[in-house]
């Protein structure tokens, strides 16, 4: 049964409709139709651009807007989900089952539940205020966030910019709360930089080491140089940058052969002390200093589309925090922890904060959210809309 978008349980019904679309990235399977069908009767103009990139599947996206004047508040999110996995679910991952006060399904937390709350809050706001509310509301919803994210928000924003669309602030509905709704607003994200380090040696028999050059001691030496000293001590809103080695490999199954190369991969999550360029220069400096003339190496730093960024705690952040406090009684922490999100693209268009449901079970078997949290998050988004567009 289609959701009654104006019922008290509209967020739950919309979330169920979305979950019942098995939109494992990059498939849509009707998920964006659910969004469009909710917004179109309220007067939103709907666009459905599909973006392409060689080597990647074409991906549908949705842009919706009501109003052309005044400040524009954007709700952003994604309707694609990760695969359901191989574990046994207590409930069908694409049924949207409710049991013991919990909504189960892939995407319940990340982030079909958040999208549903945005939709329900906006429709209720328009019911209260009508179309002449003193501004504009837009939706940026992609089907390419859980995948490579090349045909999603980054291209949708460029498409909107070329059409002359302008935005003032954005709420991205990612599941930001660790354990309780209202705990945390994300006001920024760390950057991400991946490096591939290769130390060059000369293959030979282990019984004749003088005729070979073992690259493994050199790799250990260079790896130690990267982690011996902290990259920084952290900043006002960010923890210290962190470098982690993720793979080490010599490609050598033989026990009597000295390998010709030794490779390691690492990833750095970095704060706003650095850009990808300045961090790359520091990494190379440390390696060259440690290598001297004794170790031959190559370094491949993968281009990063995830710089560190911060949305300064200003009046908009305060507005959202006050809406959360009014509904939950909690004062949210302003955080920059966690991985990357599409906020890294949105921050170039307008200030962006992230606030959504509890993410404790996202990407897990039996992903679920509390039905009561869907209602509370809808109310929080409603308070944000009322405060952002106070009217006369």
Swiss-Prot record:
Native source species: Methylobacterium radiotolerans (strain ATCC 27329 / DSM 1819 / JCM 2831 / NBRC 15690 / NCIMB 10815 / 0-1)
Cofactor annotation comment: Binds 2 Zn(2+) or Co(2+) ions per subunit.
Function: Catalyzes the hydrolysis of N-succinyl-L,L-diaminopimelic acid (SDAP), forming succinate and LL-2,6-diaminopimelate (DAP), an intermediate involved in the bacterial biosynthesis of lysine and meso-diaminopimelic acid, an essential component of bacterial cell walls.
Catalytic reaction equation(s): N-succinyl-(2S,6S)-2,6-diaminopimelate + H2O = (2S,6S)-2,6-diaminopimelate + succinate
Pathway: Amino-acid biosynthesis; L-lysine biosynthesis via DAP pathway; LL-2,6-diaminopimelate from (S)-tetrahydrodipicolinate (succinylase route): step 3/3
Full protein name: Succinyl-diaminopimelate desuccinylase
Chain positions recorded as Zn(2+) 2 binding sites: 110, 146, 363
Molecular function terms from GO: acetylornithine deacetylase activity; cobalt ion binding; succinyl-diaminopimelate desuccinylase activity; zinc ion binding
């Amino acid at each position: 049964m289609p959701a009654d978008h104006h019922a008290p349980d509209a967020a739950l019904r919309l979330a169920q409709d979305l979950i019942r679309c098995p939109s494992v990235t990059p498939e849509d399977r009707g998920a964006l139709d659910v969004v469009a069908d909710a917004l179109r009767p309220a007067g939103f103009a709907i666009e459905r651009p599909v973006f392409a990139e060689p080597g990647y599947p074409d991906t549908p996206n949705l842009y919706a807007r009501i109003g052309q004047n005044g400040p524009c508040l954007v709700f952003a999110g994604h309707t694609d989900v990760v695969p359901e996995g191989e574990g046994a679910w207590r409930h069908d991952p694409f049924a949207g089952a409710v049991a013991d006060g919990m909504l189960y399904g892939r995407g319940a937390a990340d982030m079909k539940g958040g999208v549903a709350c945005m939709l329900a809050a906006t429709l209720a706001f328009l019911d209260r205020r009508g179309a002449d509310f003193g501004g504009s509301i837009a939706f940026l919803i992609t089907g390419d966030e859980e995948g490579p994210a090349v045909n999603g928000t980054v291209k949708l924003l460029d498409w909107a910019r070329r059409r002359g669309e302008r935005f003032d602030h954005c709420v991205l509905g990612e599941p930001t709360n660790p354990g309780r709704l209202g705990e945390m607003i994300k006001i920024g994200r760390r950057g991400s930089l991946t490096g591939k380090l290769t130390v060059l040696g000369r293959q030979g028999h282990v019984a004749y080491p003088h005729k070979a050059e073992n690259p493994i001691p050199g790799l250990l030496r260079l790896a130690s140089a990267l982690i011996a000293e902290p990259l920084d001590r952290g900043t006002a809103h960010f923890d210290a940058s962190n470098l982690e080695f993720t793979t080490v490999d010599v490609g050598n199954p033989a026990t009597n052969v000295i390998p010709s190369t030794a490779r390691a991969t690492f990833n750095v999550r970095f704060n706003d002390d650095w850009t990808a360029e300045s961090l790359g220069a520091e990494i190379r400096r440390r390696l060259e200093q440690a290598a001297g003339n004794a170790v031959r190496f190559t370094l491949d730093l993968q281009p990063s589309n995830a710089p560190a960024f911060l949305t300064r705690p200003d009046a908009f952040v305060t507005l959202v925090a006050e809406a959360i406090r009014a509904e939950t009684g909690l004062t949210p922490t302003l955080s920059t922890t966690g991985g990357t999100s599409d906020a890294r693209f949105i921050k170039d268009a307008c200030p962006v904060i992230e606030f959504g449901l509890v993410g404790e079970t996202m990407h897990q078997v039996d992903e679920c959210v509390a039905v009561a949290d869907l209602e509370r998050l809808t109310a929080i988004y409603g308070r944000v809309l009322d405060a952002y567009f106070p009217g006369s």
